[in-house]
Amino acid sequence: MSRLIVRGLPSYLTDARLREHFSQKGAVTDVKLMRRPDGTSRKFGFVGYRSEQEAQQALDYFNRTFIDTSRISIELAKKIGDEELVHQREERRNRRNAGAGPEGSASTSDARKRKADKSDTQQEEGSGKKKPKKGGAISFEEFMSVMQPKAKRKAWQNEDALPEQTMQDIVAPEEAIQKKAARKALKKADAAAAATATAESTAAQPDSGREETPEPDAAANDVGLTDEEYMRLRMKHRVGTDLDTLEQSSSGPEFEQSDNEKDDDDAAADSDPESEDEPIHDQGFECKQAEMQRKAQQAAEKDQKLVDQIMESGRLFIRNLPFAASGDEILAFFESFGTVKQVHIPLDKQTKASKGLAFVSFSDPAHALAAYRAKDGSTFQGRLLHLLPAVNKDALAETGSKKTATLKQARAEQKKQDATKDFNWSMLYMSSDAVASSIADRLGVNKSDILNPGANGGADNAAVRLALAETRIIQETKEFLAQQGINVDAFQGAKGPRSDTTILVKNIPYGTSAEEVEKLFGEHGEVDKVLIPPSGTIAVVEMPVVNEARLAFRAIAYKRFKGGILYLEKAPVGLLTQHKVGEKVVKQAPIVGKSIDSSNPSVDLDGPAGAGAGDEAVDGATLYVKNLSFSTTDERLTAFFHGLSDFAFARIQTKPDPRRPGARLSMGYGFVGFKSIDAARTAQKAMDGKVLDAHTLVVTFARRNAEASTTSISSGGSTKILIKNLPFEATKRDIRDLFSSQGQLKSVRLPKKFDNTTRGFGFVEYSTVREAQSAMEALKHTHLLGRHLVLQWSHLASSTQQQVDMQRSKTKQHFVNTHDNAARADPSKRAKIKLNSAQISEAIKQAKRQRDDVDDDE
């Protein structure tokens, strides 16, 4: 958790002051002071950091410290929906419900009554007079005494003693019982009046001539009734709710209660002493239940709508992101749920800064839904994320353009969309015309002289001559890119991740300048760097803003430029190894450049790689070092053995890193060479068991065959090369002319079908490993007749062929022995020549060899 909760803050503290205080221990991404609706501080807040480590350091440093004179306490903030928070919330709710229940209400009301009685007693003791209660029995008695006629009043009645007598009645416990009985009688009278209202309206009218005599008012003489209760008895229509009446009628009310029914009512009252104070049916509760159900249904419909949008688009809209968050960080945050196609961060057009928003597109909409469920409201670099479904803009664009786009426009748009995917062209693809123009301009001859068969005693095939020219241009291009800080090995990681800011511009016409390329891409955003090799056949463009680079890629891909079509491809990640922020554009003249010497290959196979490779070790003086730490480098191993006498070299065996194109990983072992065998023996005894980088070394003498085998497999040190994707029109002579430029060939083989056509692959074998390696480095990006030659080492194929030959020889020996034993068993029978399958296959193989020899002679 990278978010902290800070308690005990001063009430006057501001957000800026809180941010400044906590910025001492890391990069603060969010500050939130909690306030009341009136704006006053609640004296606690939240602080977010970029990483959990920074948050933990701030917690250890600031906890129980002071801001001004207030001591603060800090804890790691809980996530939304945490079980502990839910449990605490339920406990508080239960305590409130317990305090608001019947018993709690009664106890609260009793306490209030006692407090009121106490205050009245204190007031009476202090003043000697008692203030009569409003609406109590005193006011009613005063009213009745005043309203009585003088004939009925007693002349000697002492009116001053009335309040005191009434107070005694109130204090007497019998009054509560009388009030309760009066309340029951009131309810029964109300129920009877409500039930007989209709009957009285439709009943026969009494004799009009007879005058009804008024009945005596018994309630007027009942001193136990209050003013409100008396007035309620005299009202024709009941004011208030009829819930009590409905409940009484549902239980079978009668016009006049019998004794048994009265007993039943008394029993019901005894069983539920609070029934007369509480309504039987709570219409408010039912309304609340209906409202809650309606809100729950609306929430479910809204959630289902969000799910449908996510499943349709597979795209999420993220809010409240840190402004410093990068696309790679967001990608790493969401890629645990599935494959992320794209992360788009909108930027401000003026400042090029993030707006705190992002769009994340998933390959599978189910993965997007899982990310929405898990990460909505989660903490990312100290901020609480808010996730929403995003609309698929590609679908909207397709819907708007389907009606107006022609077939040609639709195909062009499809090509642009496919350009963002895995590109099928070679990374160093160059236009054949540009290659010929570059070589002709450099040599000062016409292009026809370059392509003229047999010119200057060269190859007779124009395709081979053009392929050789392309090979030369590619070597110069690779050297130029290496001088500019480009990782050339990254071009081999075709299936690795691609950069969103570096673009390879291919198939550009010869003579294109860096200014023209910069102007072409500058229409869509800021251009940081443009690299054009001396040949002028390819360009590397770097744009610092990801969104602008994506826009330029979509706009320029397959665009016509100077009579040609531009092919764009995203460069591999790690291509620019020495990139500097804000570096000026490198404007290289198309023809300016120094060509390389092809006789000096860049890779030396025979000598040991790594530190100290310039010295040569004698045979049998190489040590094999095991149990090396994966963090140990060649320099570290060299420094460890450099103090020994006759030290020659030290290297660590490595392999390509599949996650980082162009990088290599240690294999945990290496080799150390010495100039003499005696020095190697001394070093083996001295260094065996030593500790290097917390690892105990195991030092033994290297076996030459094992070392050669390991070197051959790891570095591709073989003399035979497998050539794939060969044109079907290519002949053995074309392959020989192309590959013989890199060294002396021992054999060239093109497997053919039964109709004597090639099968699209072949084999070439050199005399030495150095020549084979030189050919591999020089020709792996070359095109022949428009096809990219795919080169691989064939040492695995050779080992497989050896196993097949051994199995064939065993099978042949088995059948020969069986035939000889049968002939010895019955010598009288005439022996017949029988060929088994192994012999037949051997005969076919021999015939093919003879036919290949004839082709070589031709």
Curated annotation (Swiss-Prot):
Keywords: Nucleus, Repeat, Ribonucleoprotein, RNA-binding, rRNA processing
Residue span of region Disordered: 87-138, 150-169, 178-229, 241-280
Record's subcellular location: Nucleus
Biased composition annotated in UniProt, kind: Low complexity: 191-204
Residues covered by the RRM domain: 2-79, 314-392, 501-573, 621-704, 719-796
SUPFAM superfamilies: RNA-binding domain, RBD
Pfam families documented for this protein: RRM_1
Metal-binding listed as a keyword: no
BP GO annotations: rRNA processing
Biased composition (Acidic residues): 256-277
Superkingdom field: Eukaryota
Entry's Gene Ontology molecular function annotations: RNA binding
One Gene Ontology term, aspect cellular component: nucleolus
Disulphide bonds in the chain: none
Keyword Zinc-finger applies: no
InterPro entries with a match to the protein in the record: Mrd1_RRM3, Nucleotide-bd_a/b_plait_sf, RBD_domain_sf, RRM_dom, RRM_MRD1_RNA_proc_ribogen
Protein purpose: Involved in pre-rRNA processing.
Family: Belongs to the RRM MRD1 family.
Designated name of the protein: Multiple RNA-binding domain-containing protein 1
Gene that this polypeptide is encoded by: MRD1
